[in-house]
Amino acid sequence: SSLTIQFVEGQFVDSYDPTIENTFTK
């Protein structure tokens, strides 16, 4: 589960919006 989220989050969010990445990652 964690691996899937990290993968999708790293790929999708990175191409989606940096702001979302910061909110989820941080």
Swiss-Prot record:
Name by which UniProt lists this protein: GTP-binding protein Rheb
Cell division recorded as keyword: no
Database matches in InterPro entries: P-loop_NTPase
Organism: Crocodylus siamensis
Residues annotated for GTP binding in this entry: S1, S2, V13, Y16, T19
Gene this chain is encoded by: RHEB
Function: Binds GTP and exhibits intrinsic GTPase activity.
EC class (word): hydrolase
Family: Belongs to the small GTPase superfamily. Rheb family.
Molecular-function GO terms, alphabetical: GTP binding; hydrolase activity; metal ion binding
Binding annotation for Mg(2+): S1, T19
Keyword list, A-Z: GTP-binding, Hydrolase, Magnesium, Metal-binding, Nucleotide-binding
